[in-house]
Amino acid sequence: MSSAHKKINAWVWVAVVFAVCAVVYGVLSSYPRELAVYSDELRYLDVARSLWQGRGLRVRNMPSDYQKILYPLFILPALALKTTAAQITAIGWLNALYASSAVFPAYALCRATGQNRRRTVFLVGVVALLPTMSAASTFMSETVFLPLSLW
């Protein structure tokens, strides 16, 4: 088997790990929520909604100089859905996708640093099972910043 073929197979394996993680974390994030309690979640959702509606950066319908807009930009696709419940569920699934995508840069880092296959499997597995992945069940920017920090 050629080296290029082995690399393709390894990337397929990483893609399977990503898909499994995304489904598991997506299912775990699909529970009824009450947003009235968590101020960060409300702020992210308010900023995303104001951006979606073309009203600029607003928090509770008031102009804001809020600077943490990367995560609200990432949850914008969920706002295309009609009901708040559907939007919240979609955000949970988007978070699961974003957090699970950390396995790709983890694998690339292992390959770039010359780790052997056994260590690579271990390290990618650790990233896939990090307790930080539980952030996918909330509206937390960590779901976006974990994969970005690995790149």
Q: What is each PLM-predicted segment?
A:
Residues 90-114, 151:
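Transmembrane-helix motifs of polytopic, lipid-linked glycan transferases
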Residues 106-129, 147:
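Transmembrane-helix signature of polytopic, membrane-embedded enzymes
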Residues 1-7:
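Short, Lys/Arg-rich, polar N-terminal cytosolic tail immediately upstream
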Residues 44, 99-103, 141-150:
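Hydrophobic core segments of transmembrane alpha-helices in multi-pass, intramembrane catalytic enzymes
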Residues 33-50:
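Extracytoplasmic catalytic-loop and juxtamembrane helix elements of membrane-embedded
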Residues 9-38, 128-129:
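Transmembrane signal-anchor helices characteristic of membrane glycosylation enzymes that use polyprenol
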Residues 46-51, 62-84, 143:
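Short hydrophobic/aromatic helix or loop-helix immediately within or flanking a transmembrane segment
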Residues 38-39, 64, 137-145:
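Short acidic/glycine- and proline-prone juxtamembrane loop motifs at membrane-interface regions
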